[in-house]
Amino acid sequence: MQNSPWFKENPLRLFITGRPGVGKTTLIKGLVSELRELKIAGFYTEEVRERGERTGFLFVVIGDGSCPLASTKPIGKERVGRYFVVDSLTLLPQVKQRLEVADLVIMDEIGPMEKKIGDLWKLIQGVLSSNKPVVASVHRSMNIEGKRYELTPVNRDRVREDILNEIRRYFGTKQDTFSL
């Protein structure tokens, strides 16, 4: 299906942006759960908290484990805000392998932190220049071409439905294929 010229010329590009804590990662994780019928590759980030305070982030490969991404403790040379960013990600080979057979790529987040990790940034750029359909959360500062959704506490449910409908249209599936 994705070898047709239409898919190559019109790759799906849906991007979610919004303030920190508004629910971007929750939405991304929900999409992964709801779209089980598709082969999904990619990653999302999860907060690491100690005594109620955010102290870092984990890099979670969809369906294949997690590893540190950033920490308030020195785990790499580069910094973004108060976080030290790892120099490389141990699970990047798993992401690359899964991308080859994926129907849909989901990434959370594309932002300054991810840009500091050379191999990860190359992978993100490669995905964005490919014909693979992509749904990703992006930092407000990133200028990436595609349809952008500004997530707020008020519009979370509508944005979720809109994104699911866009994916349905793209893959030509029936309305009831994916649960709402």
Curated annotation (Swiss-Prot):
Superkingdom of this protein's organism: Archaea
Which InterPro entries would you find in this protein's record? AAA+_ATPase (IPR003593), Nuc-triphosphatase_THEP1 (IPR004948), P-loop_NTPase (IPR027417)
Give this protein's Gene Ontology molecular function annotations.
Answer: ATP binding; ATP hydrolysis activity
**According to the UniProt entry, what is the EC number of this protein?**
3.6.1.15
| Top enzyme category | hydrolase
Question: Which residues take part in binding ATP?
Answer: 18-25, 104-111
Sequence similarity: Belongs to the THEP1 NTPase family.
The job of this chain, per UniProt, is described as: Has nucleotide phosphatase activity towards ATP, GTP, CTP, TTP and UTP. May hydrolyze nucleoside diphosphates with lower efficiency.
Q: What is this protein called?
A: Nucleoside-triphosphatase THEP1
